[in-house]
Regions:
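Conserved sequence signature across two-component system core domains
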Residues: 6-7, 32, 50, 77
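A generic structural motif
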Residues: 23-29
Length: 87
């Protein structure tokens, strides 16, 4: 399963990538610090699963998720409990 990590916090990206790489059926294709460039990456690469931070500068994770192809799975990551219901 091809994955992307999108999070504005460097330590969160590093931690998620280390965790995901422990599972042989998951392959991290890339990491992004914000939503910029993700749409273009998705046009050129087959991505099955996004680990997506909600609170990021510019386009937030919820806005980005609304633009994704329906078949793309999303696991939202956030430090803010107020986003739990909306995500």
């Amino acid at each position: 399963m091809n994955c992307l990590i999108i999070d504005d916090e460097p330590l969160a990206r590093i931690g998620m990538e280390r965790l995901i790489r422990q599972y042989s059926h998951l392959k991290v294709l890339g990491t992004f610090r914000n939503a910029i460039g993700v749409a273009d990456f998705l046009k050129d690469n087959e991505v099955d699963l996004l680990f997506l931070d909600i609170e990021m500068p510019g386009v937030n994770g919820l806005e980005l998720a609304r633009t994704l192809p329906e078949h793309t799975l999303v696991i939202f990551t956030t430090a803010y409990s107020q986003y739990a219901l909306e995500s």
